From Swiss-Prot:
GO cellular component, one term: nucleolus
Gene this protein is translated from: RRP36
Biased composition (Basic residues): 127-138, 145-154
Compositional bias segments (type: Basic and acidic residues): 67-93
Name of protein: rRNA biogenesis protein RRP36
Length: 313
């Protein structure tokens, strides 16, 4: 090999010399590969396991180092966040102190300023105590600004039972415009309305009996008309029953006060008894039997509840 390298001259190479040089280089590389293969063949299984273990240890150490680095970075980040929070709080407190000192310096002299600075620290505690303190019963009422104020104000002493719809009202029957309502006198004045009510009921019944008219109506319209007819009949019947009850009570009071100088007025309980007696006297035989049977069952139920197995243990 040294012979060829010594005799090499630039510009005087031949093809045979180049071929010889290539063969020599190929032989050297082949010898090196064979030597490395022989070295690997001579290695035992134990040494290979040790090498694998060393590589695994190096990989684990690298992963542990990365985990430690991550932990350190997280701790640093948390410390920075806490420092930022503390700095913000300090900045807010300094601003609050600057504002309080400015207001105190404008209000008076230096001595007075020191006095007011001590009080300003306690103002926050006083406000919180006032909020937590319960209001006095004689204090003015407070309403939420989010709710709209009602157009009609509540006047003490004028608590009236408001109907479901207050859209239309008659001022003649309002307590604020006159005396208490006398139902009997109003009933006498407007007794002629019963005739109009009866006419409306008769007309509605005639319309519902007409088959041609009913066939033109839909199911919903027909049901609405039947409901209106039923409600009109019940209203008229209640008005008539009320008139009859007042008439019966009036006749009974006139009868018991026939020869008395001082007029005696019945109580509400006595009025109920008089009405029950009058209704029972003017009932038919079947109606009386039903009433007596109902009362007998009611009395039997009360007696049955008094037994020991119904008593609470």
């Amino acid at each position: 090999m040294s012979y060829y390298f010594k005799n090499l001259k630039p510009g005087q190479e031949s093809d045979s010399e180049e071929d010889d040089l290539g063969k020599v280089l190929a032989r050297n590389t082949q010898q090196e590969d064979e030597s490395t293969d022989d070295e690997l063949k001579t290695l035992s299984f134990g040494s290979l396991k040790k090498a694998d273990a060393i590589l695994e240890d190096e990989d684990s150490e690298d992963s542990e180092e990365e985990a430690d680095k991550k932990m350190v970075n997280e701790r640093k980040r948390k410390q920075v966040q806490e420092e930022l929070k503390v700095s913000k709080k300090r900045y807010v407190e300094e601003e609050f102190e600057d504002d309080s000192s400015d207001s105190d310096s404008d209000s008076g002299s230096d001595n007075e300023g020191g006095f007011f600075e001590e009080d300003s620290g306690d103002e926050i505690g006083v406000k919180s105590k006032k909020k937590n303190k319960s209001r006095h019963k004689h204090a003015p009422t407070e309403h939420s600004s989010k709710k709209r104020v009602s157009k009609i104000r509540k006047i003490p002493g004028l608590e009236t039972s408001r109907p479901k719809s207050n859209l239309y009202t008659d001022i003649r029957f309002d307590k604020s415009t006159g005396d208490d309502i006398d139902v009997n006198s109003i009933r006498k004045r407007y007794a002629f309305l019963d005739e109009y009510r009866q006419k409306e009921i008769d007309e509605l019944e005639g319309m519902l009996k007409d088959r041609k008219f009913v066939n033109k109506l839909g199911d919903r319209e027909y049901e609405d008309m039947q409901g209106n007819l039923k409600s009109m009949k019940s209203r008229l019947q209640t008005v008539k029953n009320r008139d009859l009850e007042s008439k019966v009570i009036k006749e009974y009071e006139e009868k018991i006060n026939m020869g008395n100088k001082n007029r005696y007025h019945l109580k509400e309980s006595e009025k109920r008894k008089v009405l029950q007696k009058w209704k029972f006297d003017h009932m038919k035989a079947k109606q009386r039997e039903k009433v007596m049977e109902r009362k007998r069952k009611k009395k039997l139920g009360k007696e049955f509840k008094q037994f020991e197995f119904h008593k609470q243990r």
